[in-house]
Amino acid sequence: MNILPRINAIEKTDANHHAIAWWLIGVAALVFIMVVVGGLTRLTESGLSITEWKPVTGALPPMTEEHWQEEFDLYRQIPQYQLVNKGMSLDEFKTIYWWEWSHRFLGRLIGLAFFVPFVFFVVTRRVERALVPRLIFLFVLGGMQGVLGWWMVMSGLTDRTEVSQYRLAAHLGLATLIFGALIWTALDLLNGKSTRLLTGLAKAAAAILALIFLQTILGAFVAGIRAGLIYNTWPLMAGAFIPDGLFAMTPVWHNFFESHLTVQFQHRMTAYLLLLCVVWHWWAARKTAAAPSAGWLAVATFAQACIGIWTVLWVVPIPLGAAHQAGAMVVFGVAVWHVHRLAK
């Protein structure tokens, strides 16, 4: 029996898996960059500078001074200009416009970077039929993210001077999930498909991953209401570890999403809990094959906590705020890799 054709088929399949996996990792890297640019867009208060959603014609920026003036006139009609940026010059407007345009451009680039290779892999039969639905689902999620981004921007165009923190959290949350799904799918192709979390250690890692995602969402609420600009001391807040007034708003649930004090407090407390869980998990995994990834998760989480403290103490300077945003994605990505190692 000649086994050479079978060996060649296996080698071809492995080569295809590696090509598709690295393509997905490349798309994940673009998503990472887009999230960081999105954070910079928020930190520079640039997110409302483009007041229309034109998925196709909006791909090109203004090319003439007349077109720039038209965009500026649209911006001057919204509350953010009238109440916050009254008197802004055209040159100042161009600065914030370029941040938002770059963020949207990256979204379009990610769509092309996903769609074109996907069509190529399907047409050349390099992608297995069972993987096609998952890839289509990822593409649909990307489209939904674009719609969600515009829905978020809309919240700041009428009676607000900033976007809704609820919609901001949804926008960042979906971006984080897409980022994680791209990495997970790539790891499936590189290392063999992971289907179940069989051990207690694997289930603990999955729980930590969920906690990291929750902490990312809580961070979006901190950013959305600019809670990081006050209570700029550590480890105390308002002179106490557990400050008074955490539930001053009524109804009570509003405090968790709208109170500057409570929103920052819960982000801090969740950070402490997460750091403790990650250190405990690293200790539990130190003699297993997953020790390296558990160690990297501990290092990334500790570094992110330090950046977060530094960001608060320095009253959210733009470079540190962006680094903290990037750090959240790094921690989430490392956690996805770690869970995948344990799930095999």
UniProtKB/Swiss-Prot annotation:
Superkingdom in the source lineage: Bacteria
Record GO terms (molecular function): metal ion binding; oxidoreductase activity, acting on NAD(P)H, heme protein as acceptor
Reaction(s) the record says it catalyses: Fe(II)-heme o + 2 A + H2O = Fe(II)-heme a + 2 AH2
An annotated GO BP: heme A biosynthetic process
Compartments reported by the entry: Cell membrane
Binding site for heme: H267, H324
Main location: membrane
Pathway annotation from the record: Porphyrin-containing compound metabolism; heme A biosynthesis; heme A from heme O: step 1/1
Cofactor field: heme b
EC number: 1.17.99.9
Transmembrane segments: 20-40, 104-124, 135-155, 170-190, 205-225, 233-253, 265-285, 296-316, 317-337
Family: Belongs to the COX15/CtaA family. Type 2 subfamily.
HAMAP family noted in UniProt: HemeA_synth_type2
Role summary: Catalyzes the conversion of heme O to heme A by two successive hydroxylations of the methyl group at C8. The first hydroxylation forms heme I, the second hydroxylation results in an unstable dihydroxymethyl group, which spontaneously dehydrates, resulting in the formyl group of heme A.
Protein name: Heme A synthase
